Amino acid sequence: MKKSPLLLLALCAVFSAPCAARADDVALVEIKFDDGTIRQVTIEFYEKDAPGTVANFKKLAEKGFFKGCAFHRAIPTAIVQTGDPLSKKKDRTAVGTGGPGYTLAPEIRRRHTKGAVAAARIGDKVNPQRRSNGSQFYVCISPQPQLDGKYTVFGNVIRGLDVLESVSNRSADTNDYPIERILLKKVSIVPREKLSAPATAPKPGAPSEKKPLLRRLWPW
């Protein structure tokens, strides 16, 4: 049967519209604390600099992969890390080693400025290609220049960095795992225009800004 030009145009519109609408998506991350409090963080993506990593993050978010993942690493006013599916259980033995079952090609282009969101990975000795873990990610509460050129930065926190700083300051065990179970309740991908007001990224390098550095490079 011969399809009319109008039908073809309609089909093209149906299949291409979602892709066009997703060009400037953001992630709304709901974080649940032990006392039941829920706070929200908004992340923008670096689509051009890390397209593969961004696409993977969106895919996992839309599948509900991140729901229930705990923050399993927190360094005060420096970095917080989450995204390990093994952290959904209370057994902490293997937490930090999990993922979706695959790794991602490195897209190392951006710097670790304040608010940077980056993909975690295992160390260079066993991972000289610097491939990223498929789901674990961390957020820089303050600039971490010693990590530049080593990890894929794929986004930036534009709202709620204070929430993550609060997470980083919680009491933790000797492995930097917060004693309190702080969970990703939900990660949603939405068009930026649906945000209630314009969101702007925090200004890195403010004169009064404290810049604590990590005590060590972790074998992610």
Where are these regions (language model features)?
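N-terminal secretory signal peptides that target proteins for export/translocation
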Residues: 1-2
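Sec-dependent N-terminal signal peptides
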Residues: 5-14
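Cyclophilin-like peptidyl-prolyl cis-trans isomerases
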Residues: 8, 18-220
